[in-house]
C-alpha cells in the first residue's frame, strides 16, 4: 500500500483477546491523531478495510485502528462485557484506547457498537477527541443530563431510508456540540451505500478537529 503502513494483531483487554487492524501514514510521516473504528453486528474490522476507510484515513494523516468487537469477526472467542443491546461498562472501551495507546481518539460507532461507545462517551473524565455515531443502538439508554454534559464534538450520520437512524437521532441531537450528515437514499449501513459521501463527510469533520 503506497505511502501507508498497515498491520494487524491481537490485544488483550480485560482478559479477552481482541483482533485489530491498523493503518497509518507511511515512511515516518507525522500522525495528526488516532481514529478508532467500531462496527455493527453483521460486520467487522474487515468492513473498513474493504471499503477503503482505513487507507483514506491514513492517507489523510491519521492513525486508523479498527477492532473486531467481542464475539464477532476474529474476536469471536472473546466474551462480551454485556449482553447485546445493553450498555457495556465505559471502562471496556477505555481499556481498548489505553492498550492501543490511542488517546484521545475519534471514535466511529455504527449500529451495535453503540452499546460500547455511548457509555464511554458519557463517562466522567472520558478522553475523546470526536464522536461519529452512525445510527447506533442504546441511544435511549443514556439520560438527558448525561447527553448535555458531553463536550466532545460529534458528527451524527445516518441514511434517510433507515428508521433506526431517525430514532437514534432524536436522542443524539441532545449532544450540545454536533453536526448532522443525512445520506439521501441510504439505508442502515449508509457508509456502504454512499462511500464517497461518507468519506468526504468524515474527513471534513476530522479536519475541523484540533
Curated annotation (Swiss-Prot):
Enzyme Commission number: 2.3.1.-
Signal peptide: none
Transmembrane spans: none
UniProt xrefs under SUPFAM superfamilies: alpha/beta-Hydrolases (SSF53474)
Main localization of the protein described in the UniProt heading: cytoplasm
Function: Acts as an atypical protein-lysine deacetylase in vitro. Catalyzes the deacetylation of lysine residues using CoA as substrate, generating acetyl-CoA and the free amine of protein-lysine residues. Additional experiments are however required to confirm the protein-lysine deacetylase activity in vivo. Has hydrolase activity towards various surrogate p-nitrophenyl (pNp) substrates, such as pNp-butyrate, pNp-acetate and pNp-octanoate in vitro, with a strong preference for pNp-acetate. May activate transcription.
UniProt-recorded name of the protein: Putative protein-lysine deacylase ABHD14B
Organism: Mus musculus (Mouse)
